[in-house]
């Protein structure tokens, strides 16, 4: 027999626990208070670190953000997805590592530091390389923590104890190792090729660092005369007309091309043109590249200053003539290369008027001379895409220069096979096609940049220009048997940032460190998934696959892939579908959505440090209109839930703050539901009510059976959707269950039973158990997306069920499905009850009866099965539908004047008598009737007017006829309703 003292003590302890729980859940949900200090507690407790004691592993490498950058919405979206996956797998029992790190971001970081120095009156070129690098490291130490602080604010559960930086010693060693081995394998070479050249910053750029900006320009049409004055076109002219948006490049033309199928010019193929200005004689060549329909069908070819012309020039073995220096000024002597194998060019003297001119000054002069000399045909306005440097905004020039390249054909084959045979899966699958198309046409990769900040290329030159490649100078001398007195100079260039990023999955796991814990690579490589945007499939994803498969091998010597799945998400755009950019003034900072920001601060943020200050006034006006009160604080969980709810694989998302507001309300709903559950666990005096600690299905009724069935069905769906990377569906599952099923239905049904004196104490104890059990389970399955809110509430709920096996929900077990609880019959019964309740609520709304009025309800045409079902749920039905009396009509019973609704074949009726004031309702309907009657008569008169009908467009007349028919239908229904009211 139980000791009464022990029972009383247990009750007192429970009361204390519940009161403490309520005190931790204040009346109003305040995300800033909930979040404060929580992340630091998680991090300090080591919850984000792997344990190496699990059978299954899950790992993600964080795409490294710019070390000195700030979080943008793309980062926020990406991090929300990765953290949801990481937290899910950690809770689901996997040995989990989310590997963090930052990128040195060569050109971006160097530009920031140069601007800071220029503000102090210091130019980089006036400093030594070593002194400048020291300044960059100072800047990195000063501002490098900003991005990681912001990642923490997002709740991202990365293992900070393993944080890496692409310029760390370990990663730098990996970069050197890879470069040297590729060079020794004959896969890295130095050669002259056409590159994107930034003349302002004087470095080669990757395609990703070039923005094609829509701009208004001109299309100049020039007459290029035949060398042989006896040759003419079909229409008798002794010249061809070519069009260009870059007249200055005419100085470097080496051919004119036509399409071989173009009959207008077939007789001219193989003839020659004498170029204006230079007097150079160039051939007319035939190539399918030329569009017959564009312009005259004749194209000037400048292989050294246009990527398409470069390829055409290679096909026709045309010489390349470089006319520009590194500053985009016209060379005093143009460099002529018969082919790319020729190291030293011959020189062709530039016409004196052009030597040394800046490119646009040369353009102006050339157009003026063309007009004066009679070879300017015409000038047209032209919409073009200007290639501008992403940072700095300079027009980028295709320029012929010596650079370092990776010969990627050999590396590409295993990377193609790995995707073709399914070792690596793209989600969604269509991105496999994008990857394969690029890989099958892959070009050698330019990996050198003319910068000071970055991984300096491990190559040295002697005084004769011979190249030596090794990990350091000492190894160079040893490897190549060079005497100590041989002078060596290290290459000044640094590697493309994407080179070090291409090693990211394995270099961060200490691949190049012989003293590292081998379990890290063995356990977490290949990584499980790469989460990325489609815009860097070529620049990063493909290169990671190639590099990893070349350098990382399994025990049997087969290549190891970097990741098993590539999850590709869309880009975050504004609410109108526009790309977010500083220049458009539509950028949102995730931290401002979390913490809120005043209007003036937001305006200042959007209009300061703009590349085009003239846009500031327009952006300020736009911002004040869009955010008149600034941005309120929504909290991290609402933002994360918004991101995941929009994460439909592969699609761009249009970000709308109204969505965040809606999910902030969802967080509030969970908070309030939790408080309600706790308050229903104590009596009016605040003493604990009985709460069962285990399930007792024998006393469950339909609501308990239903919510437990729905809970387990939801768990099944969530697991399935996580496995499919459908985080939008995971969010939908969570929202639908918690808001629509738990809060709107089960909590309301439970409330009715707990307030019903006829319900036994035994059942009430089970209802409280189910309320708590379902809530605690829902908190756990929601945690990967809403970590802060769920942790705060779980800490108060779990102890009441003795479920604090762990100190934090972060490492609690993820819910698993109990199939024995799922019942299709139970869910069908509940669906019927919901329809029944909804039908009464609809009638209540149509009759404009307040919720306080309890209604008499009649049921007609009820089947035997429905009658049995009704007997089990009558109390719940009456409580939630606010029904005063429930009567089942027999066949032949008189049916009073009622408002009705159908549930299948069952008719639900609410008698009108006594519920409304017939006189007042008739008066109201009469006014409405008169108004509608006037409208219908006006339209009828219009349609009776022959002038209107004959002159108005047919669609206008038809619209008026449809409107009249609709009004007449409303009048007929209103007349019948008024007749019914007269009979009450």
From Swiss-Prot:
Belongs to the class-I aminoacyl-tRNA synthetase family. ValS type 1 subfamily. Its EC number is 6.1.1.9. ATP binds at residue 582. Catalyzes the attachment of valine to tRNA(Val). As ValRS can inadvertently accommodate and process structurally similar amino acids such as threonine, to avoid such errors, it has a 'posttransfer' editing activity that hydrolyzes mischarged Thr-tRNA(Val) in a tRNA-dependent manner. HAMAP family: Val_tRNA_synth_type1. PROSITE patterns: AA_TRNA_LIGASE_I (PS00178). InterPro entries: aa-tRNA-synth_I_CS (IPR001412), aa-tRNA-synth_Ia (IPR002300), Anticodon_Ia_Val (IPR033705), M/V/L/I-tRNA-synth_anticd-bd (IPR013155), Rossmann-like_a/b/a_fold (IPR014729), tRNA-bd_arm (IPR010978), tRNAsynth_Ia_anticodon-bd (IPR009080), Val-tRNA_synth_C_sf (IPR037118). Gene3D superfamilies: HUPs, Isoleucyl-tRNA Synthetase, Domain 1, Valyl-tRNA synthetase, C-terminal domain, Valyl/Leucyl/Isoleucyl-tRNA synthetase, editing domain. NCBIfam families: PRK05729.1 (NF004349), valS (TIGR00422). This is Valine--tRNA ligase. Monomer. PANTHER family: VALINE--TRNA LIGASE, CHLOROPLASTIC_MITOCHONDRIAL 2, VALYL-TRNA SYNTHETASES. It is found in: Cytoplasm. One of its GO terms (molecular function) is valine-tRNA ligase activity. The keyword Oxidoreductase does not apply. A motif ('KMSKS' region) lies at residues 579-583. Its main location: cytoplasm. ValRS has two distinct active sites: one for aminoacylation and one for editing. The misactivated threonine is translocated from the active site to the editing site. Residues 954-984 form a coiled coil.
């Amino acid at each position: 027999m139980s000791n009464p003292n022990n029972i009383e003590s247990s009750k007192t302890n429970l009361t204390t626990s519940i009161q403490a729980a309520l005190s931790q859940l204040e009346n109003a949900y305040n995300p800033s208070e909930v979040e404060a200090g929580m992340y630091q507690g998680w991090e300090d407790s080591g919850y984000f670190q792997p344990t190496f004691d699990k059978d299954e592993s899950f790992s993600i490498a964080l795409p490294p953000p710019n070390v000195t950058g700030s979080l943008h919405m793309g980062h926020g979206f990406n991090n929300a997805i990765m953290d949801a996956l990481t937290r899910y797998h950690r809770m689901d029992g996997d040995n989990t590592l989310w590997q963090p790190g930052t990128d040195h971001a060569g050109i971006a970081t160097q530009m920031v530091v140069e601007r800071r120095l220029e503000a102090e009156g210091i130019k980089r070129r006036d400093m030594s390389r070593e002194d400048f690098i020291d300044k960059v490291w100072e800047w990195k130490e000063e501002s490098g923590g900003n991005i990681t602080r912001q990642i923490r604010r997002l709740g991202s559960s990365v293992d900070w104890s393993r944080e890496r930086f692409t310029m760390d010693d370990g990663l730098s060693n990996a970069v050197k190792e890879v470069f040297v081995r590729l060079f020794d394998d004959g896969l890295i070479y130095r050669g002259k090729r056409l590159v994107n050249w930034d003349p302002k910053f004087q470095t080669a750029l990757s395609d990703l660092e070039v923005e094609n900006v829509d701009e208004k320009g001109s299309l100049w049409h020039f007459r290029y005369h035949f060398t042989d004055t006896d040759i003419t076109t079909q229409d008798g002219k002794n010249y061809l007309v070519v069009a260009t948006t870059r007249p200055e490049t005419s100085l470097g033309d080496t051919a004119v091309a036509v399409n071989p199928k173009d009959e207008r010019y077939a007789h001219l193929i193989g003839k020659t043109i004498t170029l204006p200005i230079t007097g150079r004689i160039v051939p007319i060549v035939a190539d399918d590249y030329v569009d017959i329909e564009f312009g005259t069908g004749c194209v000037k070819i400048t292989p050294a200053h246009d990527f398409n012309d470069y390829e055409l020039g290679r096909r026709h073995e045309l010489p390349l003539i470089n006319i520009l220096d590194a500053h985009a000024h016209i060379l005093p002597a143009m460099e002529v290369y018969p082919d790319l194998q020729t190291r030293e060019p011959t020189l062709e003297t530039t016409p004196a008027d052009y030597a040394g001119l800046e490119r646009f000054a040369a353009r102006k002069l050339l157009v003026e001379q063309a007009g004066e000399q009679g070879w300017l045909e015409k000038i047209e306005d032209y919409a073009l895409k200007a290639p501008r440097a992403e940072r700095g905004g300079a027009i980028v020039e295709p320029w012929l220069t010596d650079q370092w390249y990776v010969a990627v054909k050999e590396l590409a084959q295993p990377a193609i096979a790995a995707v073709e045979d399914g070792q690596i899966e793209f989600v969604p699958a269509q991105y496999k096609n994008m990857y394969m198309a690029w890989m099958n046409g892959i070009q050698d990769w330019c990996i050198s940049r003319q910068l000071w900040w970055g991984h300096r290329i491990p190559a040295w030159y002697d005084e004769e220009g011979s190249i030596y490649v090794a990990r350091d100078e000492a190894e160079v001398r040893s490897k190549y048997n060079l005497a100590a007195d041989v002078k060596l100079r290290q290459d000044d260039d640094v590697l493309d940032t994407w080179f070090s990023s291409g090693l990211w999955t394995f270099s961060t796991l200490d691949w190049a460190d012989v003293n590292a814990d081998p379990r890290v690579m063995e356990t977490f490589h290949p990584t499980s998934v790469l989460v990325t945007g489609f815009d860097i499939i070529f620049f990063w994803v493909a290169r990671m696959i190639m590099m990893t498969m070349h350098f990382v091998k399994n025990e049997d010597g087969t290549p190891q892939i970097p990741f098993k799945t590539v999850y590709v998400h869309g880009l975050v755009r504004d609410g109108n579908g526009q790309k977010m950019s500083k220049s458009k003034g539509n950028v949102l900072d995730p931290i401002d959505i979390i913490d809120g920001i005043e209007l003036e601060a937001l305006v200042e943020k959007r209009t300061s440090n703009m590349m085009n200050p003239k846009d500031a006034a327009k952006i300020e006006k736009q911002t004040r209109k869009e955010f008149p009160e600034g941005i309120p604080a929504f909290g991290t969980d609402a933002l994360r839930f918004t991101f995941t709810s929009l994460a439909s694989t592969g699609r761009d998302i249009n970000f709308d703050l109204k969505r965040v507001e809606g999910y902030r309300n969802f967080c509030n709903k969970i908070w309030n539901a939790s408080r309600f559950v706790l308050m229903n666990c104590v009596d009016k005096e605040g003493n604990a009510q009985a709460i069962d600690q285990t399930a007792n299905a024998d006393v469950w009724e339909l609501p308990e059976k239903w919510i437990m069935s729905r809970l387990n069905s939801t768990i099944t769906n969530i697991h399935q959707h996580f496995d499919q990377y459908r985080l939008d569906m995971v969010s939908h599952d969570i929202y639908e269950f918690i808001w629509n099923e738990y809060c709107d239905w089960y909590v309301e049904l439970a409330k009715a039973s707990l307030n019903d004196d006829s319900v036994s104490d035994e059942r009430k104890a089970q209802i409280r158990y189910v309320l708590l059990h379902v809530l605690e389970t829902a908190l756990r399955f929601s945690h990967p997306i809403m970590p802060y809110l769920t942790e705060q509430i779980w800490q108060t709920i779990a102890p009441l069920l003795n479920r604090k096996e762990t100190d934090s929900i972060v490492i609690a077990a993820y819910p698993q499905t109990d199939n024995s609880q799922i019942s299709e019959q139970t869910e069908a019964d509940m669906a019927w009850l919901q329809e029944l309740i909804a039908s009464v609520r609809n009638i209540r709304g149509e009759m404009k009866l307040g919720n306080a009025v309890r209604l008499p309800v009649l049921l007609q045409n009820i089947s035997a099965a429905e009658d049995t079902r009704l007997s089990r749920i009558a109390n719940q039905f009456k409580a939630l539908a606010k029904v005063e009396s429930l009567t089942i009509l027999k066949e032949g019973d008189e049916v009073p004047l009622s408002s009705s609704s159908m549930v299948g074949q069952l008719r639900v009726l609410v008698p009108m008598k006594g519920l409304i004031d017939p006189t007042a309702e008739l008066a109201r309907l009469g006014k409405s009737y008169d108004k509608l009657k006037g409208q219908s008569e006006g339209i009828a008169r219009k349609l009776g007017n022959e002038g209107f009908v004959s002159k108005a467009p047919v669609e206008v007349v038809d619209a008026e006829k449809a409107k009249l028919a609709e009004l007449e239908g409303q009048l007929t229904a209103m007349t019948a309703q008024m007749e019914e009211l007269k009979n009450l």
